[in-house]
Every structure is written in C-alpha cells, then in structure tokens.
C-alpha cells in the first residue's frame, strides 16, 4: 500500500444520491467532515454513525465521513477481484485512517472477502490505515482500532 494513489475528500465533491432524512432517528451530528450526510442503509448504520460522532466529540477521532457508494471522484473503495468494496465510514485519526464497515449478522458470512481485503489493506499500510467490520453493535471492536 502506497500513498501514490491516496484518495482525498474535497468539500465540493461530496454529492450523495440522497441526504440522511431522519428516518432512523435524529442526532446532532457535529463531527461529520461535510455539512451534509449521505443516507444510511439501516438503523444499525445510523447508530454506528452516532457512536462515531460521539467518539469524535470526545476527541478520540478528528472527524468521520459517511462514505458514498459508486460515486466516482467522491467515494473511497478497495478493489477486489470481482468488484469494489466501499466501507461505510472513514475516520481520521491522529496519523491514521480507519475504515469501518457495519454488517448485519445475516450478511456476515457473505462479507468474508470484504473483511479479507480490508484487513490486507490495513496490514500493508505500515500503520497508516486501519480496518474493522462490525456486527451486532460491537462498538468495542471499533474501540480497539482507535488506540
């Protein structure tokens, strides 16, 4: 993994297909990098975003981004043999980036390739990148990557 092809988020390039409209609940997001937030696929993803924002407000991470899917130029992805993997969230930590994917327990087994490519990306980064896939609100799995 090299910085040669590093992805950068630009404020004017964040263009979600749909903004989050409050359908899973309301939360005063203060640490999302952009003024708008792309919609969440599930209540669990929304709850994960709330947890990340709370950690950012406590100073445990600098900011986070709801990653977009299949949005050229404004989405982060990891290339797989059979397509692309777009983690749900990216978090800026001091000196590192943390990619977080929330996966429902019913889709956990099918997401093994995503876990493997995320783990490989983190392993080859020399400590600059971290990855975690979470299920069943196991926020402690994210907590371990914040240290």
Predicted feature residues:
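Intrinsically disordered, low-complexity, repeat-rich regions
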Residues: 1-85, 91-96, 102-147
